[in-house]
A protein has these predicted regions:
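Structural core segment of the AMP-binding/adenylate-forming
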Residues: 1-55, 165-166, 171
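Short beta-alpha connecting loops at secondary-structure transitions
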Residues: 4-6, 88, 118, 143-146
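A generic structural signal for short coil/turn motifs at secondary-structure boundaries
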Residues: 9-12, 43-44, 66, 88-89, ...
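Conserved pre-ATP/AMP-binding loop-to-beta segment of ANL
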Residues: 33-35, 46-79, 86, 94-96, ...
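Conserved small/polar residues in nucleotide/adenosyl-binding loops
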Residues: 80, 172-174
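Conserved AMP-binding/adenylation subdomain of ANL enzymes
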Residues: 98-116, 126-169
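Residue(s) in the substrate-gating loop at a strand-loop-helix junction
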Residues: 122
Length: 174
């Protein structure tokens, strides 16, 4: 499991590590937790299970060979919102999903080398996975990422980010 000590949302700290600790009481399958220092708040670190990201990375080589994957290997599972029924885990595989988001991101946005792209969505949604993370990375797109809500601390936040980072391509899904 990879998490952070916390994250900022609307001026408050979301206790991500504490949430992970609580969820791990429900499973026996997670062996290690890697924690990124983001908010610098005090968190419980379980010896032998929890490791600071920064301490792990400083010991690693700058070189990392990519892992060879089969086309139908699992890429990720994303759960539906559960607004109409119990949330369902949707399995996304390597080749089909990556081909789809690479193609749609390229075709819809017609990204050029000098473009600055921003998708204002939540990474917890399929839109965020697809058009904040995978599509832009696969297309080598210069992207803006931000932490928090697009309307906090006020309704000008979204447009101030567009202006500050000179965004000229965007997908706003809020």
């Amino acid at each position: 499991m990879i998490t952070a000590d916390g994250a900022w949302r609307r001026g408050e700290i979301v206790p991500l590590k504490e949430n992970v600790d609580n969820s791990l009481e429900l499973t026996e399958f997670i062996e290690s937790v890697v924690v990124v220092k983001r908010t610098e708040q005090e968190v419980n670190m379980q010896e032998g299970r929890d490791y600071w990201y920064e301490e792990i990375v400083e010991k690693q080589s700058a070189e990392c060979e990519p892992e060879v994957m089969n086309a139908e290997d699992l890429l990720y599972i994303l759960y539906t919102s559960g607004t109409t029924a119990k949330p369902k885990g949707i399995v996304h595989t390597q080749a089909g999903y990556l081909t789809g988001v690479t193609t749609t991101h390229s075709a819809v946005f017609d990204v050029k080398d000098d473009d600055i792209y921003w998708c204002a969505a939540d990474c917890g949604w399929v839109t965020g996975h697809s058009y904040i993370v995978y599509g832009p990375l696969a297309n080598k797109t210069t992207s803006v990422m931000y932490e928090g809500a697009p309307n906090a601390p006020d309704e000008k936040r979204l447009w101030s980010l567009v202006e500050k980072y000179k965004v000229n391509l965007s997908l706003i899904h809020i």
